[in-house]
Amino acid sequence: IIYERIKEELRAGKGLSLAIKDGFSNAYSAIIDGQLTTIITGIVLFIFGNGPVQGFATTLIIGILTSLFCAIFITRMLLEWVEAKWGTVAFSRSWSENWLANVSFDFIGKRKVSYIVSSALVVLSLISLATLGLNTGVDFTGGRTYVVRFDQNVSAEDIRAALDGKLVSDDATKSSVEVKQYGAENQMRIITQYKYDDTSEETTAEVDALIYEALKGFYSYPITLDGFISTQEDVNGIISSEKIGPAIAKDMIYSALYAVLFSLIAIGLYITIRFKRWEWATGATLALAHNAFLVIGIFSMLYHIMPFNLEVNQAFIAAILTIIGYSINDTVVIFDRIREYITLYPKRIIGDNINKAIASTLSRTMNTSGTTIVTLLAIFILGGETLRGFIFALLLGVIIGTYSSVFIATPIAYDILRRTDKKTK
């Protein structure tokens, strides 16, 4: 944001020293608003999340605060030092100097197209959720989950058939076993509700032993029970396991719903206070709900066919709240520029001010989204199997959030503003 603002000041004909000074000054409002709204989602995550999610929320908040400090103080100090010592600082290459600097597009005039596209995606998501549902993890359903590694490639169907013969209960729903490949072909993820309402150590040991008896024949070399249940990641057998009772699962569902709801309310209130018009908050909040719902809908559409696990669990809720934080950051930058243009050009019609404001922030929007996507793709490709579903949700969120900031949040706010202003007149 700061660098793009400095580039704008340079294009306006200001000297380097003044451009740096004004670039920082004019970027403060957007930076602080954007980061505070993301911190709000981090606080909500910490309040409603469990241990690992709380750790993620803490890291997120600390990261935002340190980035904010470094951007505002350290970066400025270094830029001013370089400018004073060498008299020049390059903020772009010749080929990128005016990239997206002179965009002329009627974003507001084309808003009906974006409404149709988003409505179609929402309808598809609703159909998918009604017919296919979601791949809910044990966080929300309750149950036992295991990741088991074999010393040779195995078939998920063969593993499931073997387990069905051992994990037998009077309640058929608690006897069902779900088996999916987890990463390599010699790793399987096993989910069962067999005796999941009894989380005692004795029952856990009993279930572990039954799974061992069912699966020991799939190893080319003999494996002992102790070796099988060791939960060491670098050996064969169970490399991770988790058990969640029905009461805890129910609490997690409510916590997830409260987390998303309260984050939307808190962000909506903050936008209302900062921009002094509820219309902006309504546009932003509806766009955030749109983003979260589309990510959920796409997970519903794709979990049957993707080669990696798309599970809706606590980590997924953390991803949704992170998406909300990222999307509102992008939206606030655009809203802040619209507010600035309305102040500078009060006689210009609001539609023109909005179009100019979006066009002037487009370079920053694309650069930020592009660098974020590159980083997420690197983690998605090189990271472990456990991260892929989480990172995939973030990738979807960045793409959808960038689109909605420009084509959903701002147009909705514009339409509501027009109607309320007409009623006032």
PLM feature segments, named:
Residues I1-K425:
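A structural signal for conserved, well-ordered secondary-structure elements
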